[in-house]
From Swiss-Prot:
Oligomer and partners: The RNAP catalytic core consists of 2 alpha, 1 beta, 1 beta' and 1 omega subunit. When a sigma factor is associated with the core the holoenzyme is formed, which can initiate transcription.
Gene: rpoZ
Keywords for the protein's UniProt record, in alphabetical order: DNA-directed RNA polymerase, Nucleotidyltransferase, Transcription, Transferase
Official protein name in the record: DNA-directed RNA polymerase subunit omega
Entry-linked SMART domains: RNA_pol_Rpb6 (SM01409)
Gene3D superfamilies xref list: 3.90.940.10
Reactions catalysed according to its record: RNA(n) + a ribonucleoside 5'-triphosphate = RNA(n+1) + diphosphate
InterPro entries: DNA-dir_RNA_pol_omega, Pol_omega/Rpo6/RPB6, RPB6/omega-like_sf
Superkingdom of origin organism: Bacteria
Organism of this sequence: Corynebacterium jeikeium (strain K411)
Family: Belongs to the RNA polymerase subunit omega family.
């Protein structure tokens, strides 16, 4: 019975992580340079932020988070988690 109580209390959401988790070294393997990582993450964070601002209006112009965000998690942290999980494809340009 105790096992069932523990499983019932587990969160169904991914644990939130900050800018140091995922580690920067892991993120740098996904792009060609640290500058490319900054631009890539910033663009995606802006899309996520725009999505949250327009979702109440019923406008779905932007794609929402591809990972389960925490209530107080910032768009940049969400974007970095998406990049680390290879949910986004980066193209140089």
């Amino acid at each position: 019975m105790e096992n069932q109580d523990v499983n019932a209390n587990e969160s169904v959401f991914d644990p939130p992580v900050g800018i140091t988790n995922p580690p920067i070294d892991e993120l740098l393997t996904k792009v060609s340079s640290k500058y490319a990582l900054v631009i890539f993450a910033a663009k995606r964070a802006r899309q996520i932020n725009d999505y949250f601002q327009t979702v109440d209006e019923g406008v779905f112009e932007f794609v929402g988070p591809l990972v389960t965000p925490d209530v107080h998690e910032k768009p940049l942290s969400i974007a970095l988690r998406e990049i680390n999980r290879d949910l986004l494809e980066h193209t140089e340009g």
